[in-house]
Amino acid sequence: RESLYDSKTGLPTGPMAEEEIARMKVEDEAFTEMRFSISGFGAFNDKYGFMNADTVLEFGAKCIYEAVTEHGTPEDFVGYLDGKFVIVTKVDDPDEMLAHTVGQFNEGARAFYTFIDVDNNGILVNEGTANEHLEPLMQLEVHQQADV
């Protein structure tokens, strides 16, 4: 049996999220669908572990929920689908919501790192090997935005 809520984010997921998005598409009202992913999340998870990574997902959900509460409408939907955060909003201009969401996450995500990683502006990956590189700090990125 598939859960209706994601255990890490607390947001609707799976069939519940898919049904809500489908319902809004059937209604004869304009809306914007935005999907977000967290770049640098894999490197963070590898270095800091899954428990800290789960906390980052909770934080991401909180940022998105707060942005929708502040800048959205009561009919808006927030979910987590296929490893991405989803906002479906009926606001005419979602740019303010988008800027609030991304800005709050990107600034707050720095608190999950050590001071050294923040000073370096990233995580040193494959240290001491030919593949050594700096993986930038996590950023919330718009994966998809569509006006429907």
Feature roles, as predicted:
Residues 4-5, 10-32, 39-66, 78-82, ...:
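Conserved long alpha-helical elements within nucleotide-processing catalytic cores of c-di-GMP signaling
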Residues 28-29, 136-139:
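Short loop/turn elements that form and flank the Walker-type P-loop nucleotide-binding site
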Residues 38, 87-92, 146-147:
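Short beta-strand-to-loop capping motifs
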Residues 61-95, 107-127:
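Conserved helix-loop-beta segment at the catalytic/binding core of cyclic-nucleotide signaling proteins
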Residues 77, 139-141:
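Residues at or immediately flanking beta-strands
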Residues 123-134, 141-148:
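Cyclic nucleotide signaling catalytic output domains
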